[in-house]
Amino acid sequence: MNIQAPLIIDIEGHALTAVDKKRLKNPLTGGIILFGRNWQSRAQLTALCADIKAIRKDLLICVDHEGGRVQRFKTDGFTHLPAMRRLGEMWAQDGKGLQGEGVLNACKAASAVGFLLAAELRACGVDFSFTPVLDLDYGESSVIGDRSFHRDPRQVSLLAKSLM
């Protein structure tokens, strides 16, 4: 069996090189993931995305841009987004004895964060972000840590649904 699936590749710098352009033209390339090393300014990011789409309109432009410590673009008009754990912490904060208010506020905040994250990326030409993280935080992984909403799967799934 010979399965050929498209790859998402990366580039080194702020602009496309001749080698990058050749790789992006390859039919087995499905998209590109951007990192902090590809960021200089909002104008530069917008130009880079336009250059990528000029090569092939069907290429997906992705980024791991979650908020908190995993936010690739942090200046020049990008909002500093909270770590997902902050949204999870809102879940249990019922104000003035109103049961369920914390859940509602957490879901509303997750929806607002998701909208803002997507709008800012889309305005520059980025197609999607690899967020949210759906890992459960049992306190055993510093890699996951505050990137996770919570340790409760129900809470994680509802907040993730709200964010998306």
Which residues does each PLM region occupy?
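Enzymes and membrane/adaptor proteins characterized by extended Gly/Ser/Thr/Asp/Glu-rich
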Residues: L28-V156
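Boundary/entry segment of secreted carbohydrate-active catalytic domains
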Residues: M1-L16
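N-proximal short alpha-helices
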Residues: A5, A18, S129-P132
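N-terminal glycine-rich anion-binding loops that anchor highly charged ligand groups
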Residues: A15-T29, I33
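Metal-dependent enolase-superfamily TIM-barrel catalytic cores that perform enediolate-based chemistry
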Residues: L158-S162
